[in-house]
Amino acid sequence: MTILFLTMVISYFGCMKAAPMKEANVRGQGSLAYPGVRTHGTLESVNGPKAGSRGLTSSSSSSLADTFEHVIEELLDEDQKVRPNEENNKDADMYTSRVMLSSQVPLEPPLLFLLEEYKNYLDAANMSMRVRRHSDPARRGELSVCDSISEWVTAADKKTAVDMSGGTVTVLEKVPVSKGQLKQYFYETKCNPMGYTKEGCRGIDKRHWNSQCRTTQSYVRALTMDSKKRIGWRFIRIDTSCVCTLTIKRGR
């Protein structure tokens, strides 16, 4: 599982170029790093300049695994520091990592999504086999109340969005960096129009409740242009989840 996760992380970074949003200067190879997430060395800096041509031996693979696990721990710690206390801040969803600047379509979900899954895997590894079987949703026959789909979309798909002041802004498709331009990608989650819950939420007693699966939105930071042609980074709303809404049926 560790090697599989490392392969996913390597492929994730391989399709992405980084560049800091906090500074005007672009460092390194023009990659975009988000606040709270540190940039780390390449595989060459971990295993030496010729590691890629030699291939990974068992010792280098173990060293690489240890290095990535250390990076994962740092990223999770930083995410907890950047993410505000959700109980005291209603705008906590603004800090989700659903935006990426890349030269091509990302091959994986956002990195922090993968980190959370890997963290859950590590937690599950400490359970007994019997507890793991009992906690596995698939073994318990669990189903989602609403069917949803998640995918990367570009500014060409979105075109416009609503910012925090309620105004409509134009989402810029490309972001200039020192060595060219990168596209903005947004990881959106919405209700599946082709799913089995388009007529109502799953598992709801239709005799007493009216139910509907609805797409909800959260704020993410993106490069936009307002009606006065002013370009800047603003928080905009994108689709981030599919939830079930209920209304009680009135007696006839």
Swiss-Prot record:
Q: Which Gene3D superfamilies match?
A: Cystine-knot cytokines
Which PROSITE patterns does this chain map to?
NGF_1, NGF_2
For this UniProt entry, which residues form the secretion signal? 1-18
Q: List the disulfide bonds.
A: 146-213, 191-242, 201-244
Q: Where is this site: Cleavage?
A: 57-58
UniProt's post-translational modification comment states:
Mature BDNF is produced by proteolytic removal of the propeptide, catalyzed by a FURIN family member. In addition, the precursor form is proteolytically cleaved within the propeptide, but this is not an obligatory intermediate for the production of mature BDNF. Can be converted into mature BDNF by plasmin (PLG).
| Protein name per the record | Neurotrophic factor BDNF precursor form
This chain's source organism reads Sus scrofa (Pig)
